C-alpha cells in the first residue's frame, strides 16, 4: 500500500511540474511577443552572449525608471554567463559563486535558467509588478477520476490562469 501511495503522489507531483513548465512557456511567449511588438527593446547579439548586450538590455529598462530584476536564460546562454571571467564579477558575486557554486545574481537581477526558454533568446525584465499580471482563477487542482471497474486509479489535474503584459518596456 505504501508503494502505491508513493507512486500516485509522485505521478501527481510530476503532473503539477509539467503544468508549471507549461506556465513558463506561456509567460515567456507573452514577454517575447510584447518585445517583438514594440520592436525597439531588442538587442541583437551574434554568437555567444556578451556583457555589452546584457548591459544594453539593462539600459533599455532603466531608461524608464525601472530596475531590471530578472534575467531569464536557457542553459546554453547560461554557459556564456559562466565564462564572463573573474575580472567581470564583483566581490559579492564572487563570494556567492565560491559558497554556492552558482551564478545566481548579476548586477541588480536574479538569473533564472529554464529549459522552456528559447535557446537563442535572453529575457531581461523589470519587477513583475511593473510588467503585468498573472491572474489565477483556479489554482492547480487535483480531482480523482478513478475507474474501479477496470481497477484503475486516475485523476484530472488542471488550472485556469491568464497572462497579461501591461507594460511592454
Stretch-by-stretch model annotation:
Residues 1-40, 71, 111, 151-162:
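Long, contiguous amphipathic alpha-helices that act as assembly "spine/axial" helices in icosahedral shell
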Residues 1, 50, 74, 120, ...:
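Helix N-terminus capping/helix-initiation residues
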Residues 86-169:
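Sequence/fold signature of self-assembling virion shell proteins
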Residues 13, 17, 60-63, 105-112:
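N-terminal short leaders/motifs
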Residues 3, 80-83, 165-166:
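Short helix/loop capping segments that flank catalytic or ligand/cofactor-binding pockets
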Residues 6, 34-37, 41, 45, ...:
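Secondary-structure junction/capping motif
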Residues 33-103:
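Extended, solvent-exposed, turn-rich assembly/linker loops in the middle of proteins
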Amino acid at each position: 500500500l505504501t508503494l502505491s501511495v508513493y507512486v500516485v503522489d509522485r505521478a501527481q507531483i510530476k503532473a503539477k511540474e509539467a503544468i508549471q513548465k507549461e506556465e513558463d512557456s506561456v509567460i515567456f511567449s507573452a514577454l517575447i511577443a510584447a518585445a517583438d511588438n514594440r520592436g525597439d527593446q531588442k538587442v541583437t547579439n551574434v554568437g555567444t552572449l556578451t556583457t555589452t548586450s546584457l548591459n544594453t538590455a539593462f539600459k533599455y529598462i532603466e531608461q524608464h525608471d525601472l530596475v531590471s530584476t530578472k534575467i531569464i536564460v536557457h542553459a546554453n546562454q547560461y554557459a556564456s554567463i559562466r565564462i564572463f571571467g573573474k575580472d567581470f564579477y564583483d566581490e559579492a558575486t564572487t563570494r556567492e559563486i565560491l559558497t554556492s557554486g552558482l551564478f545566481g545574481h548579476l548586477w541588480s537581477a536574479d538569473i533564472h535558467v529554464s529549459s522552456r526558454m528559447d535557446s537563442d533568446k535572453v529575457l531581461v525584465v523589470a519587477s513583475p509588478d511593473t510588467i503585468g499580471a498573472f491572474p489565477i482563477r483556479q489554482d492547480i487542482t487535483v480531482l480523482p477520476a478513478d475507474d474501479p471497474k477496470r481497477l484503475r486509479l486516475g485523476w484530472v489535474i488542471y488550472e485556469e490562469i491568464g497572462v497579461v503584459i501591461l507594460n511592454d518596456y
